[in-house]
């Protein structure tokens, strides 16, 4: 293992030298003297340099390709962090393709038989040894069940975990060194990015997780005209093997075939937007890897086209609070109410509570106002979110991983929609859906349903209120970097406090009604408690 690690280190060093990636660090201005002096200890920097026409982004992309699939997938993750990376580097990393040669089919068969505890011939009436597709984590084979259903069998590459662990160790080492060496690097949070990647890559190794995600999405869109998700055959799913229904559709980028079957392209593009907002706001569970390779179009009703989604390994979800603030931010942005946008960021806890609203508002206006020079139909929701994240980072916003997944997915959906139908007006398509969601969220039925669920938490009210008051009495807990989970806890405590006030007010009101009139002065405390409780619940 140590020998492999040393060999890998030399491989990384050769790639760094070949593409002069050290320039990305050492050619930065205002380097600490001790770091700048390290250049003298690198012999290759003394040698004459061959002129190159490659940009820094292209050199980084080629280096990641040379380092193999784990680094390629890391580069793909980086390409989604446009709130962090310079545009030239992000654009180049978007070109990375997760395509690797297939592994030996005999190994795939052996792994399937080991996982299922049966011979392939006992489970499938036909199994194609030539894979349909091959990527860095798994490859896919076509097969037919004994009962006649056509399926695909996804198999994790054997021996992948040690390789991933080794490459992740080097990525963490590089990230930590970059954070120590450069203020610009610290602003990009490289260790945090590698940590997010570690979670993502290990999640992708567990095919039971992908099967569960697919089942949830299928249930969410059952009998829907918008999207179809293939059936999972749970009896044949294991941590390293996934068996799903085989679908036959047109790749969403195959414009010629879609045109030949007279697909309604405008409706298809609009339904893509509706699929996104349905997942985010109705279900709070969204497919977060909706690039064109994972999306097909059904051939059944071209006049009423339906999407088919595959590869559900990466999903995202939003809290009710994030859903609410996201919708309000979009409405405020399109009204050019930048003060409202700034205040919403502060209220949501996305930026520290001590942020100066006027300064934040001015920064948002400076970044976002040029966007409105374009026609409304050309404005990108994904770009709006990216610009807001970039601005908010200057005010110490910690962008939650789920919001990054959301922004990445939105960019994919937008790009796809405008490729299908260039005149797609995203805001006109999304606005009615958002308005309907906001109306439903604040309808009397929803408010009282929310109240009922929170009244059930009344037994915990005393303890949570005491904890909240203790935290508020300790100044050091007002740190701008207060973890999100503590902010969420505070919100829940305030909701429960509101529920308690409502309950107490109802008791007082009932007593006042028996002894006097609800309009009498004796009933005023009850009305005050009811009003305060309702305010706390709705406000939170």
From Swiss-Prot:
Chain segments annotated as transmembrane: 24-44, 496-516, 518-538
Matches recorded under SUPFAM superfamilies: Protein kinase-like (PK-like) (SSF56112)
Membrane topology: Multi-pass membrane protein
Biological process, per Gene Ontology: regulation of ubiquinone biosynthetic process; ubiquinone biosynthetic process
Record's keyword terms, sorted: ATP-binding, Cell inner membrane, Cell membrane, Kinase, Membrane, Nucleotide-binding, Transferase, Transmembrane, Transmembrane helix, Ubiquinone biosynthesis
Gene Ontology terms for molecular function: ATP binding; protein kinase activity
PANTHER family on file: CHAPERONE-ACTIVITY OF BC1 COMPLEX CABC1 -RELATED, PROTEIN ACTIVITY OF BC1 COMPLEX KINASE 7, CHLOROPLASTIC
Protein name according to UniProt: Probable protein kinase UbiB
Organism of this sequence: Pseudomonas putida (strain ATCC 700007 / DSM 6899 / JCM 31910 / BCRC 17059 / LMG 24140 / F1)
